[in-house]
């Protein structure tokens, strides 16, 4: 079996997007293998239903080595209100 070199190693990213409209600020959490492409999809209306029709910016990302790890982190971040509240506070300042 050939070893995977760091160049060919696939990483999974967990990310948090932010979008502001008038007096409303929203966040969205997801995971992907191509962060730049995924952000473009969200902004083009091809992303998740809840992200359509908004301009999104990347607020936070982290990489994971496995899909399972990325999915677990996504779940954790989605359910960690303190984390998302902290992000909102940073954006508002």
Description of each model-found segment:
Residues 1-50, 54, 61, 68-83, ...:
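GIY-YIG nuclease catalytic motif and its immediate N-terminal context
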